[in-house]
């Protein structure tokens, strides 16, 4: 009986410490670049490079206007090309997350073919984040 009681007395603090430990926090998004988007169809490149680190996800966020994206091409560190499928329309303040293939990948650059939609009234800014 003393052995059971002693074992419980040792295990309870360990269990409580484990329950009180905070959950691991998600890595914050790192701003990789921004571009102002014109009303006509435009092409831009955001150079990223190995110095920025390795990423599992990229996130595109539209600011101050609505962006219509026709093509997004991501050149990975090893030269592989990744193209998320479909056309994207991002409203003001809206973002879209792109999961990169594989585990942590370095990114050389991201190519965009896009335009601001006139109905929003002003040119949009697109921000690229990684984590």
Map each language-model feature to its residues:
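Bacterial N-terminal signal peptides that target proteins for export
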Residues: 1-10
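N-terminal Sec signal peptide cleavage junction
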Residues: 19-20
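Eukaryotic extended interaction platforms
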Residues: 24-29
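Solvent-exposed serine/threonine-rich low-complexity stretches and specific carbohydrate-binding patches
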Residues: 33-35, 84-90
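Short, surface-exposed binding/anchoring microloops in extracellular/periplasmic proteins
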Residues: 38-69
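Exposed aromatic-hydrophobic patches
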Residues: 44-49, 95-102
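Noncatalytic modules at the cell exterior or secretory-pathway interfaces
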Residues: 53-60, 102-119
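Short, surface-exposed beta-strand/strand-loop-strand elements in extracellular ectodomains
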Residues: 63-86, 122-130
């Amino acid at each position: 009986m003393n052995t059971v009681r002693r074992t419980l007395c040792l295990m309870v603090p360990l269990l409580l410490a484990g329950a009180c430990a905070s959950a691991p926090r998600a890595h914050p998004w790192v701003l990789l670049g921004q571009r102002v988007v014109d009303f006509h169809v435009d092409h831009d490149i955001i150079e990223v490079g190995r110095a920025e680190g390795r990423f599992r996800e990229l996130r595109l966020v539209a600011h101050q206007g609505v962006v219509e994206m026709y093509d997004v091409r991501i050149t990975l560190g090893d030269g592989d090309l990744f193209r998320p499928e479909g056309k994207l329309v991002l409203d003001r303040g809206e973002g879209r997350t792109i999961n990169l293939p594989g585990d942590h990948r370095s990114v050389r650059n991201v190519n965009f073919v896009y335009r601001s939609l006139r109905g929003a009234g002003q040119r949009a800014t697109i921000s690229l984040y990684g984590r």
